[in-house]
Amino acid sequence: MPEAIRAVRGMNDILPDESDLWGFFEDTIRTWLAAYGYRNLRTPIVEQTDLFVRSIGEVTDIVEKEMYSFIDQLNGENLTLRPEGTASCVRAVIEHNLLYSGPQRLYYSGPMFRHERPQKGRYRQFHQVGVEALGFVGPDIDAELIIMCARLWRLLGIPDVRLEISTLGSIESRLIYRARLISYLEKFYDELDEDARRRLKTNPLRILDSKNPGMREILEGAPHLFDDLDEDSLIHFDALQRILRNQGISFEINHRLVRGLDYYNRTVFEWVTDKLGAQGTICAGGRYDGLIAQIGGKPAPACGFAMGIERILSLISETDVAAEIHTVPDVYVVHQGDIAAGFSWKVAESLRDAGFKVVLHSGGGSFKAQMKKADASGARFAAIIGDDEAATGQVSIKSLREAVEQVKIDLTKVAVFLENI
């Protein structure tokens, strides 16, 4: 017997029991985003590699080490499985001239791919929901993105998620700060870990996000970006804080908050939990006013966020909400006899027409065995059909969950009967 083929490491199957929770999340997301006027945009999983090099940044970890890239053997194109969704969204907006009709509120969802070391909350194929507001310049849209996240946590029943915010200022102010940060860190070069040394000349702000406990003391003494912020960025950040306070949104200012993607400026934020260990960020985003021009479009402001679905579902699975999410049939149709077997199809389809979830027993078996399967299915009712019932166009309804007397009624009345129990 040949060896069984398994899924690629870090790329997981979503089994039926898990899919119930995914379905609940996806339904909630669609309703939530519609309430804020966001529309769905769907982009290809594969993009030109240069899209991510230009948008994410050539010296980021994602581009240097984590992308799944390959050469198309047919035409020699350098292609990449998308590692994130914002760049693809912006590319589509530019390509199809969507901003010509005004600012856009858009969202996407689907799988992303990064070649990372798999661990809890971090996979090589993972899923994100991303929300993008393109063409909006003020702090009010930054606040909208944050406020809508707070609503989502309530809808999903997720407690104990805290908001951290900061500002990265303008490109000019970051360049000034970058020079000061490098000068400071060079004094501790021998004490820096391998990642920090590599990033020192290429992406020094990412060092601030180090999870290495041995770097903590060095980073605590590092200069603050706030000391170099331009006046417009400070005004923007102050206005954002006022809106959040007025709307009752609690937050912490985290001076070390940076994003792993080069395109961010001004507002950045993360929603964080302590329940997922090192992978505690469940949603992150901010403003990226230069990205549209960077990819080849007419300059326009933009901001957005992305959330990791697997991490959020891990939190939901520990709540009371998860216990109530389980897809089971309303009715399990049991039948005995050749005439009954034929009539059972009509019964099942009639109930489905009325909106009931119905499982029609397949595979034969005794009445006792079928009833056992009906009970195990989780269905509330069994619709029992023998040749006698089939001959008269009737169905026996038995409650599987309550002490209710079994009744025999005409098929034409079954749906109304079940709706009123």
Curated annotation (Swiss-Prot):
Major localization class: cytoplasm
A cellular component annotation (GO) from this entry: cytoplasm
Family matches, as InterPro entries: aa-tRNA-synth_II, aa-tRNA-synth_II/BPL/LPL, Anticodon-bd, Anticodon-bd_dom_sf, His-tRNA-ligase, HisRS-like_core, HisRS/HisZ, HisRS_anticodon
Compartmental location: Cytoplasm
GO BP term (any one): histidyl-tRNA aminoacylation
EC number: 6.1.1.21
Enzyme class: ligase
Keyword Metal-binding tagged: no
Keywords assigned by UniProt, alphabetized: Aminoacyl-tRNA synthetase, ATP-binding, Cytoplasm, Ligase, Nucleotide-binding, Protein biosynthesis
Catalytic reaction equation(s): tRNA(His) + L-histidine + ATP = L-histidyl-tRNA(His) + AMP + diphosphate + H(+)
Cleaved signal peptide residues: none
Molecular functions per Gene Ontology: ATP binding; histidine-tRNA ligase activity
Keyword Aminoacyl-tRNA synthetase on entry: yes
PANTHER family attached to this UniProt entry: HISTIDINE--TRNA LIGASE, MITOCHONDRIAL-RELATED, HISTIDYL-TRNA SYNTHETASE
Family: Belongs to the class-II aminoacyl-tRNA synthetase family.
UniProt subunit comment: Homodimer.
Name by which UniProt lists this protein: Histidine--tRNA ligase
Gene source species: Nitrosomonas eutropha (strain DSM 101675 / C91 / Nm57)
